Structure formats: C-alpha cells, structure tokens
Amino acid sequence: MASIAAERIDRLHTLARAAARTGDDDRAREYVRLARRLAERNRLTLPPAFRRFTCDDCDAVLVPGRNARVRTRSGHVVVTCDCGTHARYPYTG
Amino acid sequence: MTTITPESLPRHELLGLHARVAADTDQSRVGIAGRVVDETMQTVVLRTASGVAQVPKKGATFEFRLTDEAAAPDNGVGTAFKPAGGETRQTTGESVAYVTVDGGRLLSRPERRSENGVDSKWR
C-alpha cells in the first residue's frame, strides 16, 4: 500500500507530463516542484523516470527534441535542458 | 493503482480532479466548475469552460468528481486512438463518485495537506 504522498507524486508526475505535452510548461514546472516538495517532506525517493526527465535547475519536464538535447559521449549520456543545465548519466557497454 | 477515496481526499492530490463549487458564502461563485489546475494555501484554481477561476477555500464547499483515472488528462494523446463510438471513461457510470468537502478542511499548503491528522514519528 503506497502512502498518500507517494500516490500524489505519481499523479503529479502524470499531470506534469500531460501539461508539458500541451505546451503548458510553467504549469508543468509547478507540478514538478510540488512533487519534489512532497518527496522532501515525506522522505521518499522520486521515481527514476521523474529524476531523469526533469531539470534539476529550472524544474522543467524534459521532452527530448523539444526542450532537451540528449547526446551520448564516451561513457555517459548528456541531457541538456533549454535553460543550459547539463545532466550526465553513466552507461556501460 | 492510484486511489483517492472519499476519506483520503482532503489529504490527497486535488490537482487534475474535476471540481464544482456546490456552495459558497459568495453566491456569485456557486456553480463554478472545472478541472483543478493549481492550488495555493487558501485558494483552488479551476479551469472552467470560460477561463480560469481562483476560488478561496474558506467559505466554499467543493464537490469533487472521482473517477478510476482522474489523473489521466481529459485531452490526452490517447484520445485520437479511441475507436469511433467506443467507450469513454465518462460512460462507465459505476466508476464515478462525487465527494463534497468543506473548503475549510483544505486550508493548508498543498504539500502539507497530506500530513494533516498524522502523528509525527519524530517525537
């Protein structure tokens, strides 16, 4: 049984992606901020998909090709948000 | 998977739900209905057919509509793939419930509402 906070984060994630899809970027940001705040207060880990596809700096929901660039470098993926923030994720193989 | 019950609603996520102002101390606000798009400590923001309305929680009574997939967007990408004349989620009558909540019970910051009425473990 997931806690209410975990369920709220899950819903907010869905809502944020839906808002980003319809071009409502600022609304999506607010949903991301609220989800982060909930995780913080309730000591929960955000889902991996949430952590990867939101900007650490400006809280935007990252949509590759629209507001994010995804490039592979040797040993890591670089995701660049439109605000200029890079996030690097290692990979092997 | 995600479940909002009438009991947990005041502590659960209101964003994305459909709400209607059932009663209000200000008569002009009664009947405002739409999707909850934002929430502040003292207000709820509804997207109505005629625009966006910010309704104070204090003094208002809200009627929320709970469906099986309330978090799914009304105009999601899946819409285009539904067969013509097929079932929509609105037609499955038994999965819809209406919950009436006094706005005073929602007076709290959105992120703090989930903790109302819960004993802290850290005492």
From Swiss-Prot, chain A:
Top-rank EC class of the record's enzyme: hydrolase
The record's Pfam families line, in alphabetical order, gives: Rpr2
In which compartments does the protein localize? Cytoplasm
Cofactor(s) needed, names only, are: Zn(2+)
Q: Where does Zn(2+) bind?
A: C55, C58, C81, C83
Question: What does the cofactor field's note say?
Answer: Binds 1 zinc ion per subunit.
Coarse class of the protein's main subcellular location:
cytoplasm
InterPro entries from the xrefs? Answer: RNP4 (IPR016432), Rpr2/Snm1/Rpp21 (IPR007175)
Q: Does the keyword tRNA processing apply?
A: yes
Keyword Cytoplasm among UniProt keywords: yes
Per the record, the GO terms for biological process are: tRNA 5'-leader removal
A Gene Ontology molecular-function term? zinc ion binding
Q: What EC number is given for this enzyme? A: 3.1.26.5
Q: Which GO terms describe its cellular component?
A: cytoplasm; ribonuclease P complex
* Keyword annotations from UniProtKB, A to Z: Cytoplasm, Endonuclease, Hydrolase, Metal-binding, Nuclease, tRNA processing, Zinc
Reactions catalysed: Endonucleolytic cleavage of RNA, removing 5'-extranucleotides from tRNA precursor
**What positions belong to coiled-coil segments?**
none
**Source organism superkingdom:** Archaea
Self-association state and partner proteins as the record states = Consists of a catalytic RNA component and at least 4-5 protein subunits.
Query: What is the protein's known function?
Result: Part of ribonuclease P, a protein complex that generates mature tRNA molecules by cleaving their 5'-ends.
The UniProt similarity line reads: Belongs to the eukaryotic/archaeal RNase P protein component 4 family.
Q: What is this protein called?
A: Ribonuclease P protein component 4
Curated annotation (Swiss-Prot), chain B:
Subcellular location(s): the record lists: Cytoplasm
The primary location reported for this protein is cytoplasm
Q: Does the keyword Hydrolase apply?
A: yes
Q: Which GO terms describe its molecular function?
A: ribonuclease P activity; RNA binding
One family from Pfam that matches here is RNase_P-MRP_p29
Keyword tRNA processing carried by entry: yes
Kindly state a single biological-process term from the GO annotations of this entry. Answer: tRNA 5'-leader removal
Q: Which UniProt keywords apply?
A: Cytoplasm, Endonuclease, Hydrolase, Nuclease, tRNA processing
Q: What is its EC number?
A: 3.1.26.5
> GO CC terms on record?
cytoplasm; ribonuclease P complex
Q: Give the reactions, separated by semicolons, that this protein catalyses.
A: Endonucleolytic cleavage of RNA, removing 5'-extranucleotides from tRNA precursor
Which InterPro entries is this protein grouped with?
Answer: RNase_P/MRP_Rpp29_sf, RNP1, Rof/RNase_P-like, Rpp29/RNP1
Region (Disordered): which ranges? 73-93
Q: What class of enzyme is it?
A: hydrolase
Family label: Belongs to the eukaryotic/archaeal RNase P protein component 1 family.
Q: What does this protein do?
A: Part of ribonuclease P, a protein complex that generates mature tRNA molecules by cleaving their 5'-ends.
Q: Subunit composition?
A: Consists of a catalytic RNA component and at least 4-5 protein subunits.
What is the designated name of this protein?
A: Ribonuclease P protein component 1
Gene source species = Halobacterium salinarum (strain ATCC 700922 / JCM 11081 / NRC-1)
Source organism lineage? Answer: Archaea, Methanobacteriati, Methanobacteriota, Stenosarchaea group, Halobacteria
What would be the name of the gene that encodes this protein? rnp1
